[in-house]
Swiss-Prot record:
InterPro entries: Exonuc_VII_L, Exonuc_VII_lsu_C, OB-fold_nuc-bd_dom. This is Exodeoxyribonuclease 7 large subunit. Bidirectionally degrades single-stranded DNA into large acid-insoluble oligonucleotides, which are then degraded further into small acid-soluble oligonucleotides. Its EC number is 3.1.11.6. GO terms for biological process: DNA catabolic process. It is an enzyme of class 3 (hydrolase). It comes from Oceanobacillus iheyensis (strain DSM 14371 / CIP 107618 / JCM 11309 / KCTC 3954 / HTE831).
Length: 455
């Protein structure tokens, strides 16, 4: 009986074989909405495809999703082609997606809008990064297909308008899987060679044929270029990501040639106009100054130069006399000022000030000595007075008047007869020595200080 029971693994493998062998499940075309989208670090995409009533788990491996031209997002309606199989580890069926595109909008357009929005947020289209196109370029790089009509239009236009310009063509692929790398690499190479301007473009075509100029790799190369870049992709109605990133957008390759260089004919016309303007201004200048010269010739100075010289000589003599008088007066005034300053300096001579300072210092020194002597005298008298006061209470001075201090055998001062006994040995310290004796009698004084009874 036990042999009738299957393991979970065996059952799951059986169901998987059944589903894998069903031709209807091997090629599924499915419409639904994306939810729970997750792009794993290994490159695989995990998501749920749902409608109003049901949902199914799905996975799109990196080998398939790297071909997508748009970035899947939650809430996006998509058209899917894939197959149904069982994920054995969880025992659940899921959809393995091989192809996917937006539902209701082309995948290329979806990819274009997504990249456009992302680069716009990153500042790729900002005017602050746009570089000016030089007015008179000497060296121009053209990055395009060497065989298309675009290169002929660009070269013909520039050589016709500005024959002196030097043009270098960088041949690239402009469509196909390898085109974006070819274009980006040539932009970087041309930028490193210090051209004045770079033209990047191609002739018209479908959106698929122009798609290389909508790739992020090409947009990044244009944005990072230090050389000004003119984008010239397709016709006037065609708009690519490269047009938004470039420093200047030309509606056609022919227009790119016109925008890149000035017209030599127009320059020559401007030069001719400026020459005529300069000649006219020069003629006016000469005419004006001839009039001024004629007016000067009619003045008194030109008509009567000798009289004018004599008049000026008299004015000069008068001026010289006035100058001499003023100089003498100035010298006299300066002399008086000088004498006055000498007197002031003499009264304020440093030696005089020094003598006054020395006299004042001597006076201060004498006053200081006098005050110090007075202070010492006062302190000496105060000291002697304190010594006299101390002498009055000095025990030695008291003993000189006939008093003595008694001590017992232990050297302690005897202050009362109560501390003595008959036959005690005592020492009497007098002014000029000591006396040893024995107690033979003890009399205690009464309250009046008179002798009392024997103890």
């Amino acid at each position: 009986m036990k042999d009738k029971y299957l393991t979970v693994t065996a059952l799951t493998k059986y169901v998987k074989r059944k589903m894998d062998s069903d031709p209807h499940l091997r090629d599924i075309w499915l419409r639904g909405e994306i939810s729970n989208f997750k792009h794993h670090s290994r490159g695989h995409m995990y998501l749920t495809i749902k409608d109003d009533s049901a949902r199914i788990q799905a996975v799109m491996f990196a080998s398939s999703n790297r071909k997508l031209l748009f970035h899947p997002e939650n809430g996006m309606n998509v058209l899917i082609r894939g197959e149904i199989s069982v994920f054995e580890a969880y025992g659940q069926y899921q959809l393995y997606i091989h192809e996917m595109e937006p539902d209701g909008i082309g995948s290329l357009y979806q990819a274009f809008e997504q990249l456009k929005e992302r680069l716009h947020k990153q500042g790729y289209f900002a005017d602050e990064y746009k570089k000016p196109i030089p007015r008179y370029p000497k060296n121009i790089a053209v990055i395009t297909s060497p065989t298309g009509a675009a290169i002929r239009d660009i070269l013909t236009t520039m050589k016709r308008r500005y024959p002196s310009v030097k043009i270098t063509v960088f041949p690239v692929l402009v469509q196909g899987n390898q085109a974006k790398a070819s274009i980006a690499r040539s932009i970087q190479q041309a930028d490193s060679l210090s051209y004045d301007v770079i033209i990047v473009g191609r002739g018209g075509g479908s959106i698929e044929e122009l798609w290389s100029f909508n790739e992020e790799e090409v947009a990044r190369a244009i944005f990072e270029s230090k050389t000004p870049i003119i984008s010239a992709v397709g016709h006037e109605t065609d708009t690519t990501i490269s047009d938004f990133v470039a420093d200047l957008r030309a509606p056609t390759p022919t227009a790119a040639g016109e925008l890149a260089v000035p017209s030599q004919v127009e320059l020559l016309d401007k030069i001719e106009i400026q020459k005529r303007q300069l000649a006219r201004l020069l003629k006016q200048y000469i005419s004006q100054h001839e009039t001024i010269l004629h007016q000067l010739r009619q003045t008194y100075a030109f008509k009567y130069p000798h009289q004018l010289v004599k008049q000026k000589e008299q004015e000069l003599d008068s001026t010289m006399d006035n100058l001499q008088r003023r100089m003498k007066s100035k010298v006299s005034d300066d002399k008086l000022t000088h004498n006055h300053l000498i007197k002031r300096l003499s009264s304020q001579h440093p030696q005089r000030e020094l003598r006054l300072a020395i006299d004042k210092l001597r006076q201060l020194h004498s006053l200081q000595n006098k005050m110090m002597n007075n202070y010492l005298e006062q302190q000496s008298q105060r000291l002697y007075s304190q010594i006299d006061k101390l002498s009055l209470v000095n025990p030695l001075e008291i003993m000189k008047r006939g008093y003595a201090l008694p001590y017992n055998e232990d050297g302690a001062l005897i202050k009362s007869v109560k501390h003595l006994h008959i036959n005690d040995t005592i020492q009497l310290r007098i002014a000029d020595g000591e006396v040893t004796g024995k107690v033979t009698a003890i009399k205690e004084a009464n309250e009046n200080g008179n002798e009392g009874s024997n103890v």
